[in-house]
């Protein structure tokens, strides 16, 4: 309470439980001799010496002078917003134990640019585990997709079939080469490319099909590959979500002539920013190395195959630092541990939300029996946009960060330039309005997951 007996309250949320903090106020007043004010949405114990404040749970206790200091309050609120404090964040990058060791080792070896020792370790691990002809780390999955477009020699006027329900990079990588994206709708069960709609979209100008394994659940690759083979069209798998997932006992990313991976902060295995190009058709290996090395044959030079290297083709700088590769290698080494954690979290959501979802008309993820998913994300398909909006708002009030996902690419400003119209992809349009993703990261604690589940049970719409 302040000098006038009132509590100064700045509401960053609406889930203050006043009875649970009354005793805290009394204790802090006795210990520190000041009357607290409150700011919500601030998890964990924090002490900010600069501000002279203390934080417990979701409540920030301020001395009276701090509460009335405009500069302090402005900086504090900005700090809270910028650091995105939730009791349960949507995503949190997790360490597995050897990242710092490998980073220090890479620094000691005095090779921190691309294609150092740890880059080669990552390449070998991916090639041997997945059985691909070649794996090449890149600076992002976006850049791996751009490399794929260059390798396929995509030209202006070519057409590339991509799902409308995907990240912009899936389409943009080919648009950069002058191609026209042809947007295909998704299946209502797995949210993957609807293979039954594929053949009717193919024309004489179609050069590639890009299936996206949404949430790490495999697309129906048998059908896609059969159609692609019949029309002599390349298949590039966007496997950003699906590393180590399987379709009919075969790893995702090993079906198309090329495939791409993501090691972004939000993915199962991360180095902050990064990706990989998987080459399944050996005819593309040499040119892939050239494109990745600024259009030079530098890789052949370092293997002793030529006495000097020079500019031989188009290309760019797609090599990540070996520091990033060192971090990533620690994560890839722990792949079984990471996947086991994510599997437990995913199944716990599924088990504890299934009855609730059935009663409330909500759909949970669908995984066909012939697919082994990667446990990349867990989502709810709400009845409509209004229900989705209210659930996200309710979870935010309870300190839980939940998010929607892709907006339909065919209805984006850029997509409309390629002829996209409302109604072209009706399943995508519906799913985009209804889907909400729940927190899922390797170190999500059971008590925090229970908090999320209980908050969902309480939600009304």
Residue locations for each model-derived region?
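Short beta-strand-to-turn element immediately C-terminal to the catalytic PLP-Schiff-base lysine
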Residues: 261-262, 275-280, 329
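Short hydrophobic alpha-helical segments enriched in small aliphatic residues
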Residues: 5-7, 17, 33, 38, ...
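Phosphate-binding glycine-rich loop
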Residues: 115-159, 173-177, 183-184, 250
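PLP-dependent aminotransferase class I/II
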Residues: 78-79, 119-124, 129-135, 196, ...
């Amino acid at each position: 309470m302040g000098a006038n007996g009132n509590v100064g309250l700045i509401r960053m949320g609406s889930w203050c439980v006043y009875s649970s903090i009354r005793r805290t106020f009394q204790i802090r007043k006795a210990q520190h001799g000041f009357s607290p004010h409150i700011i919500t949405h601030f998890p964990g114990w924090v002490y900010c010496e600069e501000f002279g404040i203390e934080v417990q749970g979701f409540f920030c206790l301020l001395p009276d002078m701090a509460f009335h200091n405009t500069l302090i309050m402005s900086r504090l609120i900005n700090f809270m917003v910028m650091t995105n404090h939730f009791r349960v964040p949507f995503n949190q990058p997790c360490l597995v134990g050897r990242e710092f060791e490998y980073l220090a080792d890479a620094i000691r070896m005095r090779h921190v640019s691309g294609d150092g020792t740890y880059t080669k370790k990552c390449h070998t691990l991916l090639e041997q585990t997945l059985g691909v002809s070649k794996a090449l780390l890149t600076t992002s999955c976006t850049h791996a997709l751009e490399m794929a477009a260059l390798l396929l020699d995509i030209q202006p006027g070519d057409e590339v079939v991509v799902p409308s329900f995907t990240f912009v990079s899936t389409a943009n990588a080919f648009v950069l080469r002058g191609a026209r994206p042809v947007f295909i709708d998704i299946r209502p069960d797995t949210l993957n490319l609807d293979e039954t709609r594929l053949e009717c979209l193919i024309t004489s100008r179609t050069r590639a099909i890009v299936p996206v394994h949404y949430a790490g659940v495999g697309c129906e690759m048998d059908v896609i590959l059969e159609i692609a083979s019949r029309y002599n069209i390349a298949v590039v798998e966007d496997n950003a979500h699906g590393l180590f997932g399987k379709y009919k006992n075969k790893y995702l990313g090993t079906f198309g002539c090329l495939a791409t991976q993501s090691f972004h902060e939000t993915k199962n295995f991360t180095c902050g920013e990064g990706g990989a190009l998987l080459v399944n058709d050996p005819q593309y290996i040499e040119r892939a190395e050239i494109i990745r090395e600024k259009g030079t044959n530098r890789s052949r030079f370092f293997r002793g195959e030529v006495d000097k290297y020079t500019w031989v083709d188009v290309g760019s700088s797609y090599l990540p630092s070996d520091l990033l590769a060192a971090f990533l290698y620690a994560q890839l080494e722990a792949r079984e541990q990471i996947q086991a954690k994510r599997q437990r979290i995913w199944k716990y959501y599924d088990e504890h939300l299934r009855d609730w979802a059935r009663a409330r008309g909500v759909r949970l993820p669908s995984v066909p029996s012939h697919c082994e998913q990667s446990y990349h994300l867990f989502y709810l398909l709400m009845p409509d946009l209004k229900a989705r909006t209210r659930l996200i708002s309710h979870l935010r009030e309870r300190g839980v960060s939940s998010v929607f996902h892709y907006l339909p690419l065919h209805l984006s400003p850029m997509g409309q330039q390629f002829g996209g119209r409302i109604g072209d992809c009706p399943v995508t349009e519906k799913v985009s309005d209804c889907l909400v993703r729940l927190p899922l990261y390797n170190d999500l604690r059971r008590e925090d997951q229970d908090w999320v589940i209980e908050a969902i049970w309480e939600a009304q719409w």
